[in-house]
From Swiss-Prot:
Binds to the N-terminal domain of the chaperone ClpA. Residues 1-10 have a biased composition (Basic and acidic residues). Belongs to the ClpS family. It comes from the Bacteria. NCBIfam families: PRK00033.1-5 (NF000672). Residues 1-22 are annotated as: Disordered. One of its GO terms (biological process) is protein catabolic process. Involved in the modulation of the specificity of the ClpAP-mediated ATP-dependent protein degradation. It comes from Xylella fastidiosa (strain 9a5c). This is ATP-dependent Clp protease adapter protein ClpS.
Length: 106
């Protein structure tokens, strides 16, 4: 809501409120990048665990990543995208896989 300052005849401060539209926050794509070492089953687990995909959808995304080199896991606000990227990269590192997750503005 925008506010406009106005003074009345006694020089008292008055506020006029108007209707303004607030733009939605920018969305970010969370992406998985293909590598030659991470097992396909591990990628499916990541997609199910961190992106709430069922087995069929996770398999489709995994195959897309495998054949195209990159795949979209979802669209999120910046903070959520950053959190998911960090969680996936940490999970991959702990399990000694080079799977890389990244994000870019949609």
């Amino acid at each position: 809501m925008s506010q406009k300052t106005v003074h009345d005849q006694d020089n008292a401060l008055l506020l006029e409120t108007g209707n303004t539209k607030v733009a939605p926050p920018p969305r970010y794509q969370v992406l998985l990048l293909n590598d030659d070492y991470t097992p396909m089953d591990f990628v499916i687990v990541v997609l199910q665990q961190f992106f709430a995909m069922d087995l069929k959808k996770a398999t489709q995304v995994m195959l897309h990543v495998h054949t195209r080199g990159c795949g979209v896991c979802g669209f999120y606000t910046r903070e959520v995208a950053e959190s998911k990227v960090a969680q996936v990269n940490e999970f991959s590192r702990i399990h000694q896989h080079p799977l890389l997750c990244t994000m870019k503005q949609a």
